[in-house]
Regions:
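Tandem CBS (Cystathionine beta-synthase) repeat/Bateman regulatory domains
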Residues: 1-168
Length: 168
């Protein structure tokens, strides 16, 4: 993967000594993330997603454990197919009662970069959990791409400077 980006190999457990530091560099902590409790009402979830302008958010239980990911589509299909609800009636339905088509697979805080990138390729955000599966935050695909893009510019800049110096 990293060779495709022109950055050499990604750090490994052996080369860095602390893999957790690698992926946690990208972490948006739980206190800065919009998430939904599984016992919140469908209406509360819709309003939270609308307020934050998100199309998908992590779902956790009251003990802080990551349960899955809920999307706008999950909610709309639930309203149409499972509950046939008005918005007022949606106050009585919890997020846990909705079927989720797919969940964003989490990584553990001590996962390696390859695992993070593998998941980020197919998910807009990657939930991060601790060894007890407590939700601790997310890593966005945007942050990972931005980091590697900036690194690629750093690699290209010295090469450009060398080429300019050789011409003079």
């Amino acid at each position: 993967m990293s060779s495709l980006l022109g950055l050499g190999s990604l750090p490994s457990r052996e080369s860095t000594g602390s893999v957790a530091m690698n992926i946690l560099f990208f972490l948006t902590p739980k206190n800065e993330v919009a998430y939904i409790f599984e016992d919140e009402s469908l209406r509360q979830a819709l309003e939270k997603m609308e307020y934050h302008k998100y199309s998908a958010v992590p779902v956790i239980n009251r003990r802080g454990k990551y349960v899955g990911t809920i999307t706008e589509g999950d909610m709309l299909w639930g309203i149409k197919n499972k509950f046939n609800l008005s918005l007022k009636e949606a106050e009585q339905v919890t997020v846990a009662a909705l079927d989720r088509r797919s969940d964003n697979r989490p990584v553990y805080a001590d996962s390696n970069m390859e695992d993070l990138i593998d998941k980020a390729l197919n998910q807009n955000f990657v939930p991060v959990v601790d060894d007890q599966k407590n939700f601790i935050g997310i890593i966005t695909r945007k942050d990972v791409i931005r980091y590697f893009y900036n690194k690629s510019l750093e690699v290209q800049q010295p090469v450009a400077n060398c080429q300019t110096a050789a011409i003079q």
